Structures are given as C-alpha cells and as structure tokens.
A protein has these predicted regions:
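Intrinsically disordered, low-structural-confidence terminal and linker regions
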Residues: 1-34
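Conserved N-proximal alpha/beta basic substrate-recognition cap immediately N-terminal to
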Residues: 26-153, 157, 176, 314
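Active-site nucleotide/adenylate-binding loops and adjacent lid/helix of ATP-dependent enzymes
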Residues: 113-230
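Protein kinase-like catalytic core scaffold
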Residues: 168, 242-244, 339-341
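A long amphipathic alpha-helix within ATP-dependent nucleotide-binding catalytic cores
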Residues: 203-206, 211-224, 237, 242-334
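Glycine-rich phosphate/pyrophosphate-binding beta-alpha loops
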Residues: 229, 249-255, 344-346
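A short beta-strand motif that forms the metal-chelation/ATP-contact edge
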Residues: 331, 335-346
Length: 346
C-alpha cells in the first residue's frame, strides 16, 4: 500500500514539475536560483573583457528574441566570452526549448514510457530484452535494504554477495548528472563502507545497488578513476536504429563518474574506424583538451581497439529497444563484453 502511494506521489510530482517548468519565466527563475554553473558564469560575465557590456547586452537581446525565452543559456554557455558570429551564437539551443518544445515533438505521442527515466525500471527492461548490463543486487527504499524481489535483508547478507575488492555503485533510481551517486564503494577492503548508516543516504530517494564494471585496459588508461562510457546518440526511424554520433565520456582524477555535470570531458569517436577527434571538450565550463588533463592521454591518433566488433555489439544492443524516437545510450566496454549502463531520452 505504501509502495503504491509512493509511486503515485512520485508520478504526480513529476507531472506537476513538468507542467510548471513549461512556464519560461518559472523555468528561468528556478535555474537562476539553483544552477551553480549559471551563477559562476554570470559572475564571470560581469568582469568580461572579451566583449563590451553593450555588445553582450545586444547579443543577449537577439538570443532571447530568436529563441523566445530568457537568455540564460547565453550566460551558461559562456557565449559572452566567445568570439562568434551571431549566427553561430544562435546555434546554441536553450535548455528550455530542448526539454519542452523539442522533447514534446519527440515523445509527445509516446504512451509507453516504462523505463524512460528510472534506473530500476530500465534494468528490468534490459533483463527482459536480453541486454547485458551491470547486475543490480539490491534496492534501498526509504533507507531499508531490500533484495530485488522486495524482501528486506541485512548489511551482512549483502556483504556475503560481494567479493573482496569488488566495487559497487549506489545510484538514485531517478538521478541524473551523477548527482547523489556513491561510486567505487567496497564492502571488504580499500574504500570500505563498514555499515549501512555510514552511507548517509537520503531517505526520500530509492537507490539501486549495482555491481561495478571493470573496463577494458585501453579505456582504463585514459582515466582509471571512472567508468568511461560511450554516449551513443541513436535516432529511430520506422523502428530501425541509426547511430547519429558517439562521444567517449571521460571522468576526471578522483571522480568516480564520467558525467559532464561532475567535471567530465567528452571526445568524439569516428563512426567508421573508432578514432578519436583531436580535441576533447567540456560541456560545463567550456574548454578544449588535446590530452586528458590528469593522465596526459593524447587523443589525436588514438582509437578504440577492435572497433568493428565493438560497433557491431552496440548496434545489437540499440536494436532491442525501439519505443522512442531518440535515445542517448551510455555504453561501457568491459573486459569481456559490451554493456548498456543506461539510456537517456532525447
């Protein structure tokens, strides 16, 4: 009964939040008050010398007029500090347009959204469709540890399922951008977690406890602290999957996730031969990198080993789900095979 109430509350909350966010000015106010990246860039803009304040004001006015929403993303993308033509500036799509207008165009008539944004539902969908993914061995609901069948069990019982040195990831089921993820958690040695209470989880969130994946050596050399995944953008036309682009997402030193919101960088992968672009980029804060800033790994001339085989396995994975029009898959290359970690709509 409680679970049904929580699911109903969660659905209602998301529905209300989605409706409220459609108001451009509420959306803008929320970002200005809560988005740390926006706030940092706003401070930089006030002392910017790349352009005059008058030029910045005029560009923001044109940006807002063109996209019909406040020019918050002009600030967040750091466009005040980039010497670009107005045409190029207008190519930067505002978040409000993407999540409201474009998202509705892509998914407005999709009625089966099961697994759309919930990591536990996605895991069950992957199991149903025969898609390899890191194993979920437990759930945590309202700070209660449960087996995947819903039966409560103890911390000691969980420890008995985990080998010495094995890493676990504890993720909110509806999280994003790497927020609130507890990564590289060990129950026996190293970065050891001695008790359930020491995790300091948020009681209102539901978490999956997932086995960590050991990535292949060539990916590990780029950055060993994170699982570096292939963000694979897929367009579905007449239920046939077409890969639009692939980016290798790479974490930074000491950070256990590769999300851009946690400082990660991305480098484009050539679809034909698996070679990397000469430079990696960073969504949050901008910048270009010819090598990984922590490990010194040089991108130019490097490639993903056995690319034809890897690409064929990716194509097999993405063909097994065709409910949506566009998906951003997160694909990991393990020591023994290729795995789907999760997917993101749009």
């Amino acid at each position: 009964m409680i679970d049904e109430f929580m699911l109903d509350w969660k659905y209602r909350y998301k529905t209300i939040r989605r409706i409220v966010k459609r108001n451009k000015f509420i959306f803008s106010l929320h970002r200005r008050l809560t988005d740390k990246e926006y706030q940092r860039e706003k401070c930089k803009m006030s002392t910017c010398t790349t352009k005059t304040q008058k030029q910045i004001h005029e560009e923001m006015k044109k940006y807002a007029c063109y996209w019909q929403c406040p020019a918050d993303d002009y600030v967040r993308y750091g466009l005040f500090d980039k010497q670009l033509s107005m045409e190029k500036i207008l190519d930067y799509v505002p978040m409000h347009y993407f999540y409201c207008d474009y998202y509705d165009q892509q998914f407005g008539d999709v009625t089966d959204m099961n697994g759309g944004d919930d990591k536990w539902e996605q895991y069950q969908l992957f199991q149903e469709r025969g898609i390899k993914t890191p194993e979920v061995i437990a759930l945590i609901k309202r700070n209660v540890l449960q087996r995947t069948n819903g039966i409560s069990f103890s911390w000691e019982e969980l420890k008995s399922l985990v080998a010495d040195g094995e890493r676990l990831f504890i993720k909110p089921t509806d999280g994003n951008s790497g927020i609130d993820i507890i990564g590289n958690c060990m129950l026996h040695q190293g970065k050891e977690v001695n008790s359930f209470n020491s995790l300091a989880l948020k009681s209102y969130l539901t978490y999956v406890v997932q086995r960590g994946l050991v990535q292949r050596d060539d990916l590990n050399r780029i950055n060993p602290s994170s699982l570096n995944t292939l963000r694979t953008i897929v367009l579905y036309e007449n239920k046939k999957a077409r890969i639009v682009a692939i980016l290798l997402r790479i974490g930074r030193k000491g950070v256990e996730v590769d999300n851009s919101g946690q400082g990660g960088i991305s480098v484009e992968v050539n679809l034909a031969d698996g070679t990397f672009s000469s430079f990696a980029g960073r969504e949050h804060g901008g910048g270009q990198f010819d090598r990984h800033p922590d490990t010194g790994y040089m991108f130019k001339g490097a490639r993903i080993k056995d690319w034809d085989d890897i690409k064929a396995k990716i194509e097999n994975i993405i063909s097994r789900i065709d409910t949506y029009r566009m998906i951003g898959w997160d694909i990991a290359i393990g020591q023994d095979d290729v795995y789907a970690v999760e997917f993101n709509l749009g």
